[in-house]
């Protein structure tokens, strides 16, 4: 009966957007813990103490409401114990539970949108590789592309204010403000690097929720501007940034100043060939029109971030390049538009002649130099690309060492299966293969030549991926099908995150 009562409370909260009572329900934190276990591939799960108590969570929340913020103690920052319990542990539990609760409106909106569009296999759209077929289809017809780095909010209050458009419960938002003020430096500039973040790994889900709501708000307005510029030709549209009256048609001149003292018009956005893709904090804005239009988009985005989100952004963070002459770095690939020339023989009566048919295609290359730099950082090779032994793994068992190297090589082969030229990828696999042999030889105090003679070709076969093994069994080495497999591009729909070696920025 208690289980049904919990589901009833969850259902009522979904219907009325009143999420605050769920914070004091123990099954919410059990759900957050289970989700952490299921998502251990994406986020590191630190687990929970067996002595965790919902009563301690309630006391922490009550303390946040009743404390005097005008009295600042020097030793407050060093106090990690609260009533004899680990304060950081319970702050992590509150953040995890709050993230699960606030995700409810977003999940309901996602389910309804998928039902309206009749998308059955929505999990395929979550794959990173699903972006590249879109790029192959759209980008060969475009001329210019701008690399856009989305700025981070300088104040956490901006994230909370953005979240209120989607969460209609003031009590939950007020608790979020108190929580961020209690456990994090309120005035800290948000900078995300692989090694340092104001949010610890244990609180990544809460940060991702806040940041994604900020990006969702930015993209919803950007999409609205793009759609209005394509369809409204006779009447200009004034952008009202209050979501209650999202937009309205106006009859005033186009020089009309919009809300927040933000002068802008939609007249220079009339380009039906604008395409936009994004992953994390980097996006690509491509167009078929002139460079003048791309420059207008560039300065519009800078002013838009400053006036609406109060985020300082410099024009230098947006780089405009011509697709036919420059490559753009996106999702670990170096992509560019290259002409694909095919010769066609035409026969007209007794005369025949050859014609060159040039078609543009997206070329995705493996970034060999940045990848060697990534391997050098983790001590698989030196900066010149020469393999070295992984000394920190020499104490492990032989099977563990081989499994680690095989797993890294398999992940890289799986992710870069869409590379147009795989010669550079084979060089990286060679570095990992020889680094594995040198690590094993160092462990057994032997030479590489002697160790290879002892193991034979079995060690090298471990580095073949599952797809390569299947194709090598089905087709002979000289068959054209096997050659097309090694040369062709393959996009997978099960890649949900980028490996640390791939993310070499």
UniProtKB/Swiss-Prot annotation:
Gene Ontology biological process terms in this record: mRNA processing; RNA splicing; tRNA processing
Keywords from the UniProt entry: Chloroplast, mRNA processing, Plastid, RNA-binding, tRNA processing
GO MF terms, alphabetically ordered: RNA binding
InterPro entries: Domain_X, Maturase_MatK, Maturase_MatK_N
Pfam families xref list: Intron_maturas2, MatK_N
Protein's cellular compartments: Plastid, Chloroplast
GO cellular component: chloroplast
Similarity comment: Belongs to the intron maturase 2 family. MatK subfamily.
PANTHER family membership: MATURASE K
Function: Usually encoded in the trnK tRNA gene intron. Probably assists in splicing its own and other chloroplast group II introns.
Protein name listed in UniProt: Maturase K
Organism: Rosa stellata (Star rose)
């Amino acid at each position: 009966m208690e289980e049904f009562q919990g589901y009833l409370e969850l259902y009522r909260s979904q219907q009325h957007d009143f999420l605050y009572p769920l914070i004091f329900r123990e099954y919410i934190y059990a759900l957050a813990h289970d989700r952490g276990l299921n998502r251990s591939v994406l986020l590191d799960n630190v687990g929970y103490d067996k002595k965790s108590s919902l009563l301690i969570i309630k006391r922490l929340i009550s303390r946040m409401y009743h404390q005097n913020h005008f009295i600042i103690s020097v030793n407050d920052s060093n106090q990690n114990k609260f009533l004899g319990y680990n304060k950081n542990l319970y702050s992590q539990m509150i953040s995890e539970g709050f993230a699960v609760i606030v995700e409810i409106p977003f999940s309901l909106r996602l389910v309804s949108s998928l039902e309206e569009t009749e998308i059955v296999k929505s999990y395929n759209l979550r794959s990173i590789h699903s972006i590249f077929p879109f790029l192959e289809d759209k980008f060969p017809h475009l001329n210019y592309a701008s690399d856009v780095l989305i700025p981070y909010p300088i104040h956490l209050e901006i994230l909370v204010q953005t979240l209120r458009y989607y969460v209609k419960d003031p009590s939950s938002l007020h608790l979020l403000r108190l929580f961020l003020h209690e456990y994090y430096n309120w005035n800290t500039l948000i900078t995300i690097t692989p090694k340092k973040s104001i949010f610890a790994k244990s609180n990544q889900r809460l940060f991702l929720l806040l940041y994604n709501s900020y990006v969702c708000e930015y993209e919803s307005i950007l999409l609205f501007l793009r759609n209005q510029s394509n369809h409204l030709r006779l009447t200009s549209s004034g952008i009202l940034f209050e979501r209650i009256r999202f937009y309205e048609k106006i009859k005033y001149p186009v020089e009309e100043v919009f809300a927040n003292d933000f002068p802008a018009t939609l007249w220079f956005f009339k380009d039906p060939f604008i395409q936009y893709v994004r992953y994390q904090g980097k996006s690509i804005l491509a167009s078929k029109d002139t460079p003048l239009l791309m420059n207008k988009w560039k300065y519009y985005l800078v002013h838009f971030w400053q006036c609406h989100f109060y985020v300082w952004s410099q024009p230098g963070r947006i780089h405009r390049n011509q697709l036919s002459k420059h490559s753009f770095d996106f999702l670990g690939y170096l992509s560019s538009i290259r002409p694909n020339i095919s010769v066609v023989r035409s026969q007209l009566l007794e005369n025949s002649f050859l014609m060159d048919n040039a078609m543009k295609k997206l070329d995705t290359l493996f970034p060999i130099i940045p990848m060697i730099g990534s391997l050098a950082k983790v001590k698989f090779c030196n900066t010149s690309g020469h393999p070295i032994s992984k000394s920190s793994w020499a104490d492990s068992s032989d099977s563990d060492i081989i499994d680690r190297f095989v797993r890294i090589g398999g992940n890289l082969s799986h992710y870069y299966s869409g590379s147009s030229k795989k010669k550079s990828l084979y060089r990286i696999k060679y570095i990992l293969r020889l680094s594995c042999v040198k690590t094993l030889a160092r462990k057994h105090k032997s030479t590489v030549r002697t160790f290879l003679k002892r193991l034979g070709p079995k060690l090298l076969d471990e580095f073949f991926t599952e797809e390569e093994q299947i194709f090598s069994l089905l087709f002979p080495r000289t068959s054209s099908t096997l050659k097309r497999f090694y040369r062709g591009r393959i996009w997978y729909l099960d890649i949900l995150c980028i490996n640390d070696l791939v993310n070499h920025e």
